[in-house]
Amino acid sequence: MSQTLTVAAAQFASHIGDPDANFEEHHAWVAEARAAEADVLVFPELSLAGHYGAERLLDITMKRNDPRLLALSRAAGETILVVGFIEEGPAAQFYNAAGVYKGGRCIYLHRKINLPSYGKLIETKHYAQGRFVDTHAIGEDWRLGLLICADLWNPALTHLSFLHGATLLVSPISSGVEAVGEGFDNPAGWAATMHFYSMMYGAPSVMVNRVGPEQDLTFWGG
């Protein structure tokens, strides 16, 4: 991988609780990114589940090495994928997770740590809390720091990612305009947050949100 990194963002409307339809959508984005010779393709938070996919949690959860995920990675060739899904972990624990895939295997997995339980967000009802922040080398010049949505609203987690050597901050999110409540501008808040981190740490950041309506939320990605 060259010093210049080409990162693509797949911002689309996931199907709630329908992994088959979402995998089909993912394969279409992968084909487009591969044709464009993108080095990295980032999908939104919970891209294979939908924002409210946890309502069908037991039907749609998957392990990090699910054959469908590995097949998606193989279809991407040399393009690195960051994919969001509900992970089935040990001891009947389920996580809001994002996996990094290359060459048909999972090379890194992040489990969301800062689970929101305010406004219209009730993630603590469904998911176990992640515990670790780390980074992963994706080339000679690049080290990927991966945090999911509300993780970025805890500055300590972002700082820890850069202490671990991140040179690129990747942030899949699932952010609806109405998620927090009236009086808070979610898109503007995210823009300020990502600009701040890039300025403070001198590193590029990539935020990827979904689009379209889902139940009582309107997503503003794209």
Label each PLM-derived region with a short phrase.
Residues 4-16, 97, 109, 135, ...:
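Active-site-proximal beta-strand elements of phosphoester/diester hydrolases
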Residues 25-40, 66-78:
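A short, N-terminal amphipathic alpha-helix
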Residues 83-85, 96-100, 134, 208, ...:
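Short beta-strand scaffold segments in enzyme catalytic cores
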Residues 7, 22, 30-60, 82, ...:
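Active-site beta-strand/loop signature of hydrolases that rely on acidic residues for catalysis
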Residues 64-83, 153-222:
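CN hydrolase (nitrilase-like) catalytic-core segments centered on the catalytic cysteine
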Residues 88-92, 144-155, 182-187:
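Active-site glycine- and acidic-residue-rich loops that bind
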Residues 93-112, 216-222:
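Amphipathic beta-strand/beta-sheet edge segments enriched in Tyr/Trp
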Residues 112-126:
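A short, polar/charged loop-to-alpha-helix boundary motif
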